[in-house]
């Protein structure tokens, strides 16, 4: 009974706390929960049979131990979802080598573990995985198998610059066996090397090794082809398109209009008519062609950095269809293969470009950049490898690309030059017509200085080539107009001659010894002679002080007759000849220097002197201003923009005159060789301009003669060494005919001048013949200059070129010792690029052509130099007059002050 009562109490007691829990639920839930747990634990305490089950479970734990690795196996099954683990699983399942190794290990493992045969498939699987791991340790890593490392091993087998006599044949089978790779891995390397002409295909799987000998030529050709295919503009277009897309996403529309409407007008380079994306033929899709195009992108890029996505969009046919996107990715991997080989060749290196959307893989060109197009024979890449270029497509690209250039950020300098030109034209002076294309020349030539300098160096290494009738020196490099002489107004009446006049090979300097001085003299008698000049038809106006020779070059040596040998500085002359298309003027007034630099002033005002000086050493065109002033003209310096390049006495030139002709031919003299002991004297070079003008007005008789000769790029420049040998009375013109004076002159002609009309006399009488004791019996050559307003002719014959072994000349005029300095205009020193003159045999007795010379009665005002042959955007009455009438009116107003002459706007009759 008691037991039953206890049992009933025990049955009732749990219900009571549950009722209590139901009642007191809202008051203290946590306490009730604890109380309920305790009450529940209380009746379960007598039932203690369950711990026995727990002990049984503990006893079975050793049996369940083999199950725990199964859980790890289950965890490992989640890993193959990653690409790397999935690749490992595929390799282990598919590779026959791995299966063979597993079979061999499985055959011997049961024999070794007979007693443990119970360790069934689970343990065998674990051991198999460890075997795969061991095999993976033995296998090379991905880095060891990389194409770049494989290419390095491949290149290490062959010399970079093999001997011309040694012929190396590459067998792809042998290379694949020696490097331990499949032959298909070698194909990628060989295709890229073949695109750069490092190897050439001989037979099937046989290639010949050439090395890097022809690599610069190949790269130069690839650069030219890349420029023809407009890759630079395509890259600029794609980059701008990305920027426009980013701006569009951020809601930043361009101020100049909707970018979408503009992009429709521009070229879509993904169209199939574009040659870069027209990868229709199988040949265009080959790795070799893609490699060449990839290299072109680097060669035409300004930054030499090409991002991979831009390269892929240009080089790979990117279709808008979704199924072709995988093909696009596959071809991007091919670009990586090309880049790996080029990296092994040390031509590019991998960099990362940080943009708005994050880092992008890119490659930077670290190979040679020291080449440009030249006239020497190049390897024809397009004929051997590249597909033919579609000319009609280029025209379509060029039209749209020109629209793009105006709004691309890198071409803002063109707009700047237009603004500066407008400032220059709006100054208070009469505008004249100027040559088409010369408006932005003064700025554009600065950016092209390196290209021109390299072209001159390349031309100098080629053959000596003949004079050309029409000279487009810069047309092969840039659409800029051919080198203008200077920007001169119609007062100079510069009109191109129809024929070349002089051409002198630099090796003709060897015809005489610089140490022996001049061996021939030319008499300058001021007689009017205009008979045979008409054959040249230069259309020159009367009274012009310039002769414009647009073709070949001229070498003149004005000797100092009392200083012994008139030996000009070889290095100085070499710099004259090395300054590419040169403009030479014989000038006396410093106002001429100011005129010459007037156009350069607007952009030079804000530049420091050092930067301006360095830029002037790079730019062209050039001008040698050689005064015939008396000794006090040393006080006359150039404008302040000339720096310390203003004056150099001819005595310093003669000091350096003992350089041999071979050193002149070498062309290695730099611009520093022009610097003499007096250049470093800033006190002489920084004289103000007002004293110059005062001296100019006080010294009317010592006026100037101009001889302006322009030579095309690569030909001999105009070489003049003028001694201090003219006094003002002998040079200064008057209203009547000028008095005669003697100038020792040597002109060495070049053989190409045969077909041109010449005036030749074996013995011309001249007033200098009595003084020329060292001349041969043939006699001197007449050198006639006009009176004012008349036309004269320069008669140069072979008698001016005499035996170099003859003695030095005596003094023809003891007064010809007064010229002390050589003033270089700032335009002259624009380009000191050194050129190696082409060697040619010495033709001493070859006749030369006729030059028209004119004498200016007045050194024109500083503002008178304006450009010619283009209508400016506004007209004043001064732009309508006859140049001769305007010049004569300026003769009458000669004595006015410089400030008045600067603001003077002369008027004349209508044309």
Curated annotation (Swiss-Prot):
Keyword Lipid metabolism carried by entry: no
UniProt cross-references to Gene3D superfamilies, sorted A to Z: Winged helix-like DNA-binding domain superfamily/Winged helix DNA-binding domain
A Pfam match: E2F_TDP
Compartments where found: Nucleus
Gene Ontology MF, one: DNA-binding transcription repressor activity
Residue numbers bearing the Phosphoserine modification: 95, 410, 840
Keywords: Activator, Cell cycle, DNA damage, DNA-binding, Nucleus, Phosphoprotein, Repressor, Transcription, Transcription regulation
Region of interest (Disordered), ranges: 254-283, 418-438, 563-645, 672-701, 860-911
GO CC annotation terms, alphabetical: chromatin; nuclear speck; nucleoplasm; RNA polymerase II transcription regulator complex
Major localization class: nucleus
Ranges of the DNA-binding region feature: 142-211, 282-367
A Gene Ontology biological process term: negative regulation of transcription by RNA polymerase II
Induction remark: By p53/TP53 following DNA damage: expression is directly activated by p53/TP53 (at protein level).
Compositionally biased region (Polar residues): 672-685
Effect of residue 334 to A: Loss of DNA-binding and inhibition of E2F1-dependent activation. Impairs DNA-binding and dimerization
Basic and acidic residues biased stretches: 595-618, 686-699
Free-text domain note: In contrast to classical members of the E2F transcription factor, atypical members contain 2 DNA-binding domains and regulate transcription in a DP-independent manner. Both DNA-binding domains are required for DNA-binding and are proposed to form an intramolecular structure that is similar to the winged helix structure of the E2F-DP heterodimer.
Subunit structure: Homodimer and heterodimer: mainly forms homodimers and, to a lesser extent, heterodimers with E2F8. Dimerization is important for DNA-binding. Interacts with HIF1A. Interacts with MN1.
Function in brief: Atypical E2F transcription factor that participates in various processes such as angiogenesis, polyploidization of specialized cells and DNA damage response. Mainly acts as a transcription repressor that binds DNA independently of DP proteins and specifically recognizes the E2 recognition site 5'-TTTC[CG]CGC-3'. Directly represses transcription of classical E2F transcription factors such as E2F1. Acts as a regulator of S-phase by recognizing and binding the E2-related site 5'-TTCCCGCC-3' and mediating repression of G1/S-regulated genes.
Family listed: Belongs to the E2F/DP family.
Name under which the protein is recorded: Transcription factor E2F7
Organism, scientific name: Homo sapiens (Human)
Gene: E2F7
């Amino acid at each position: 009974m008691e037991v039953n009562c206890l049992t009933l109490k025990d049955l009732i007691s749990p219900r009571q706390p549950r009722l209590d829990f139901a009642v007191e639920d809202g008051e203290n839930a946590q306490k009730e929960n604890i109380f309920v747990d305790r009450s529940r634990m209380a009746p379960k305490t007598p039932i203690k049979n369950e711990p026995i089950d727990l002990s049984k479970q503990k006893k079975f734990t050793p049996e369940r131990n083999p199950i725990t690795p199964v859980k790890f196996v289950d965890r490992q099954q989640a890993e193959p979802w990653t690409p790397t683990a999935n690749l490992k699983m595929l390799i282990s399942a598919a590779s026959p080598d791995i299966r063979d190794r597993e079979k061999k290990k499985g055959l011997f493992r049961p024999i070794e573990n007979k007693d443990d045969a119970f360790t069934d498939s689970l343990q065998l699987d674990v051991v198999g995985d460890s075997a795969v791991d061991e095999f993976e340790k033995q296998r090379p890593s991905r880095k060891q198998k990389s194409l770049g490392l494989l290419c390095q091993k491949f290149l290490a087998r062959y010399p970079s610059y093999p001997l011309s006599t040694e012929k190396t044949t590459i067998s792809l089978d042998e290379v694949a066996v020696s490097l331990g790779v499949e032959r298909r891995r070698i194909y990628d390397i060989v295709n890229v090397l073949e695109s750069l002409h490092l190897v050439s295909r001989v037979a099937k799987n046989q290639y010949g090794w050439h090395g890097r000998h022809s690599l610069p030529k190949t790269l130069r050709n690839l650069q030219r082809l890349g420029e023809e295919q407009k890759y630079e503009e395509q890259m600029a277009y794609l980059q701008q398109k990305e920027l426009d897309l980013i701006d569009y996403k951020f809601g930043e529309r361009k101020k100049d209009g909707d970018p979408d409407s503009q992009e429709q007008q521009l070229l879509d380079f993904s169209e199939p008519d574009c040659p870069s994306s027209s990868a229709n033929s199988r040949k265009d899709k080959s790795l070799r062609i893609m490699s060449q195009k990839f290299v072109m992108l680097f060669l035409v890029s300004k930054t030499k950095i090409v991002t991979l996505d831009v390269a892929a969009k240009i080089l790979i046919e990117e279709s808008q269809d979704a199924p072709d996107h995988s093909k696009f990715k596959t071809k991007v991997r091919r670009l990586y293969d090309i880049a790996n080989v080029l990296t092994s060749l040390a031509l590019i290196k991998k960099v990362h470009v940080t943009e708005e959307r994050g880092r992008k893989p890119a490659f930077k060109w670290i190979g040679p950049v020291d080449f440009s197009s030249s006239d020497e024979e190049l390897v024809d890449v397009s004929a051997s490898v590249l597909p033919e270029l579609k000319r009609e497509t280029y025209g379509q690209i060029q039209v749209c690309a020109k629209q793009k250039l105006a709004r691309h950020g890198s071409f803002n300098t063109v707009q700047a030059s237009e603004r500066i030109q407008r400032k220059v034209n709006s100054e208070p002076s009469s505008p004249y017509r100027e040559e088409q294309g010369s408006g932005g020349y003064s700025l554009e030539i600065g950016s092209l200085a390196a290209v021109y300098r390299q072209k001159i160096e390349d031309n100098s290494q080629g053959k000596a080539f003949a004079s050309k009738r029409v000279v487009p020196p810069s047309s092969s490099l840039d659409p800029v107009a051919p080198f203008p002489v200077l920007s001169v107004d119609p007062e100079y009446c510069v009109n191109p001659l129809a024929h070349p006049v002089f051409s002198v090979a630099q090796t003709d300097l060897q015809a005489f010894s610089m140490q022996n001085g001049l061996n021939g003299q030319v008499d300058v008698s001021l007689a009017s002679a205009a008979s045979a000049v008409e054959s040249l038809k230069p259309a020159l106006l009367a009274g012009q002080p310039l002769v414009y020779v647009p073709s070949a070059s001229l070498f003149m040596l004005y000797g100092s007759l009392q200083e012994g040998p008139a030996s000009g500085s070889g290095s100085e002359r070499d710099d004259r000849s090395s300054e590419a298309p040169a403009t030479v003027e014989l000038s006396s007034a410093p106002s001429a220097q100011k005129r010459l630099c007037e156009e350069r002033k607007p952009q030079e005002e804000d530049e420091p002197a050092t930067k301006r000086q360095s830029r002037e050493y790079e730019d062209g065109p050039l001008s040698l201003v050689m005064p015939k002033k008396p000794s006090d003209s040393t006080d006359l310096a150039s404008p302040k923009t000339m720096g310390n390049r203003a004056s150099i006495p001819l005595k310093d030139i003669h000091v350096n005159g003992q350089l041999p002709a071979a050193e002149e031919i070498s062309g290695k003299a730099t611009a520093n060789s022009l610097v003499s002991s007096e250049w470093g004297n800033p006190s002489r070079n920084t004289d103000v301009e007002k004293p110059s003008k005062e001296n100019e007005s006080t010294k009317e008789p010592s006026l100037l003669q101009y001889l302006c000769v322009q030579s095309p790029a690569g030909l001999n420049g105009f070489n003049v060494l003028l001694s201090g040998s003219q006094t003002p009375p002998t040079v200064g013109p008057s209203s009547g005919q000028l008095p005669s004076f003697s100038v020792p002159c040597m002109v060495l002609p070049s053989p190409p001048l045969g077909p041109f009309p010449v005036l030749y006399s074996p013995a011309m009488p001249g007033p200098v013949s009595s003084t020329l004791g060292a001349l041969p019996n043939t006699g001197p050559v007449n050198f006639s200059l006009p009176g004012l307003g008349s036309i004269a002719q320069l008669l140069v014959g072979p008698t001016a070129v005499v035996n170099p072994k003859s003695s030095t000349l005596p003094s023809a005029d003891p007064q010809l010792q007064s010229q002390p300095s050589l003033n270089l205009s700032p335009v002259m020193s624009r380009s000191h690029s050194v050129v190696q003159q082409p060697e040619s045999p010495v033709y001493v007795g070859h006749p030369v052509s006729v030059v028209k010379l004119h004498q200016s009665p007045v050194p024109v005002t500083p503002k008178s130099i304006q450009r010619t042959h283009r209508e400016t955007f506004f007209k004043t009455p001064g732009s309508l007059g006859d140049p001769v009438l305007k010049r004569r009116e300026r003769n009458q107003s000669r004595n006015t002050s410089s400030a008045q002459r600067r603001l003077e706007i002369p008027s004349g009759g209508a044309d």
